[in-house]
A protein has these predicted regions:
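N-terminal amphipathic alpha-helix/helix-capping segment at the start of soluble metabolic enzymes
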Residues: 1-30, 67
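Alpha/beta enzyme core
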Residues: 13-18, 32-54, 63-79, 86-207
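Short, basic, glycine/proline-bearing loop/turn elements
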Residues: 23-27, 50-55
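N-terminal start-of-chain detector that recognizes signal peptides
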Residues: 24-27, 81, 165-166
Length: 210
């Protein structure tokens, strides 16, 4: 179970408010991998997070199980559906529209994977899908690499949040490219960065300093 973590920010930084929605916590949690909805609810309450990601494909594969979604809504948290499993921009756009219909939110964590082994995001497919979704009124949270130029293109397209990986999904290797993440922070100072993959322990976030 991978939990995205935001890069530390100076105490003088503006509040975390993706797409103008103020959030008291910078922590986001995934909704998969818990042994029961009750345990998920306990984890969400203990974490103090305000945003929970959910995979639409996983939900549909499980017969449309709504218990985790009900837990999120009962706690008054923000739901962030994702397009995990998509390999093309077209797939991701279609799944995002399904998620908006099903969950009633225009927030979408955009995932377009370009490599089956590392699950590295496809920068071209991600940009294509982000551009289309932003045009359709979505608030896009793109899963991306730490490449400055690719990230800048996403911001230029209208993305107000970036979710660069720390390491390959599920690897637990922590922040492999701290310099690249610091460069993103320095060159895109107004854009919230949420480290989205590869973290195996909370202590690993301590390697990144702004």
């Amino acid at each position: 179970m991978t939990s995205p973590w935001t890069l530390p920010v100076p105490s003088t930084a503006a509040p975390f408010a993706p797409y103008g929605v103020p959030l008291a916590s910078r922590l986001m949690l995934g909704s998969a991998g818990y042994p029961s909805p009750a345990v998920l609810g306990q984890a969400l309450q203990a974490s103090g997070c305000h945003v929970v990601t959910v995979g639409l494909r996983r939900s549909l594969a499980g017969g449309g199980e709504q218990a985790p979604i009900e837990q999120v809504r009962r706690l008054g948290l923000h739901l962030l559906p994702n397009t995990a499993g998509c390999r093309t921009a077209r797939e991701a756009v279609a799944l995002a529209h399904m998620a908006r219909e099903l969950y009633g939110t225009d927030w979408i964590k955009l995932e377009v994977v370009g490599d089956e082994h590392t699950l590295q995001p496809d920068p071209w497919g991600t940009l294509e899908a982000a551009t289309a979704l932003l045009r359709d009124g979505f608030k896009v949270f793109p899963y991306c690499t730490d490449d400055l130029v690719a990230c800048r293109r996403l911001v230029d397209a209208g993305c107000q949040v970036l979710m660069p990986w720390g390491a390959p999904i599920g690897s637990g290797q922590g922040l492999l490219q701290v310099h690249a993440l610091r460069t993103l922070r320095a060159r895109l100072p107004q854009v919230p960065l949420v480290v989205d993959a590869g973290l195996g322990a909370p202590s690993q976030i301590g390697r990144a300093h702004v």
